[in-house]
Swiss-Prot record:
Motif (Polymerase core binding): 25-38
Domain of life: Bacteria
Signal peptide: none
SUPFAM superfamilies reported in the protein's UniProt record: Sigma2 domain of RNA polymerase sigma factors, Sigma3 and sigma4 domains of RNA polymerase sigma factors
Family: Belongs to the sigma-70 factor family.
Keywords linked to the UniProt accession: DNA-binding, Sigma factor, Transcription, Transcription regulation
Gene name of this polypeptide: sigB
GO BP annotations, alphabetical order: DNA-templated transcription initiation
Protein source organism: Myxococcus xanthus
Name of the molecule in the record: RNA polymerase sigma-B factor
InterPro entries: RNA_pol_sigma-70_dom, RNA_pol_sigma70, RNA_pol_sigma70_r2, RNA_pol_sigma70_r4, RNA_pol_sigma_r2, RNA_pol_sigma_r3/r4-like, Sigma-70_Factor
Function: Sigma factors are initiation factors that promote the attachment of RNA polymerase to specific initiation sites and are then released. This sigma factor is essential for late-stage differentiation of M.xanthus.
DNA-binding region: 201-220
Coiled-coil segments on the chain, per record: none
Length: 246
């Protein structure tokens, strides 16, 4: 199963080519994520392998990028990771609808990404300024530096890519976590949360043959377990980052 999906790993890795990391390294990390997914994959859950594996592939690649950029202290928590990959897009969204006050925008960005305003300012300086670590040559040939590969804030196509990237990653994470739940719990989550036309508690109870109140209790339990499994997935990919958040 690993060999059959190697080309997909290359495709995903190519999406991260702008971060100044060798493609061979990105592909290698993606392959590790794929192997992890294959080890944990359960075909009886009714989810396609590639839908499950994409979360692991992206998670390992993103984690590697963050660690590669750690020489400029970008941060290792999940919130810092989101800040790194979403800062430029989030700022443009807020400036588009705001007053143009940079201080207000920084506070808004910090609230949206669950970090401190000072962390936003520091990240912007490190990603967009002339930081010595970013300007250092990446290879022995003294050619490109890390800053040369940072996504340009002026590129409009990056907005669409970032939106799809974040939505796809969230969906893949949820799908991966759903596979860890008891057999009927994924159905409850999908029917009550993920469907465009959610089942009512009464309909859910009738489907399984129990009361509306019992359906409500099972929904709460399924949601709590899903949150726990999502946290566990993050810990498996990068336990240091999860520990830093606690």
């Amino acid at each position: 199963m690993v060999t059959a999906n190697l080309r997909f790993v290359v495709k995903v890795a190519y999406e991260y080519r702008s971060y100044g990391i060798k493609m061979s390294d990105l592909i290698q990390e993606g392959n590790i994520g794929l192997m992890k997914a294959v080890q944990k994959f359960d075909p009886d859950k009714g989810i396609r392998l590639i839908s499950y594996a994409v979360w692991w592939i992206r998670a390992y690649i993103q984690n590697y990028i963050l660690k590669s950029w750690s020489l400029v202290k970008l941060g290792t928590t999940q919130a810092h990771g989101k800040l790194f990959f979403s800062l430029a897009r989030t700022r443009r969204e807020l400036e588009k609808f705001g007053s143009g006050d940079a201080a207000v925008n920084v506070d808004d960005i910090a609230r949206r990404l669950h970090v401190k305003p000072g962390e936003v300012r520091e990240m912007e300086q490190r990603m967009g300024g002339r930081d010595l670590s970013l300007d250092a040559p990446m290879g022995e040939d003294g050619g490109n530096s890390h800053v040369d590969f940072v996504v340009s804030a002026a590129a409009p196509q990056d907005d669409e890519f970032a939106d799809k990237e974040e939505a796809g990653l969230i969906n893949a994470r949820v799908r991966a976590a759903l596979m860890r739940l008891d057999p009927r719990e994924p159905f409850i989550i999908e029917q009550r949360v993920m469907n465009e036309r959610p089942m009512t508690l009464k309909e859910l109870g009738e489907h399984f043959g129990f009361s509306r109140e019992r359906a409500r209790q099972l929904e709460i339990r399924a949601k709590d377990k899903l949150k726990s499994e999502l946290a566990a997935l993050m810990a498996e990919v990068d336990p240091e980052a999860v520990a830093a958040q606690q």
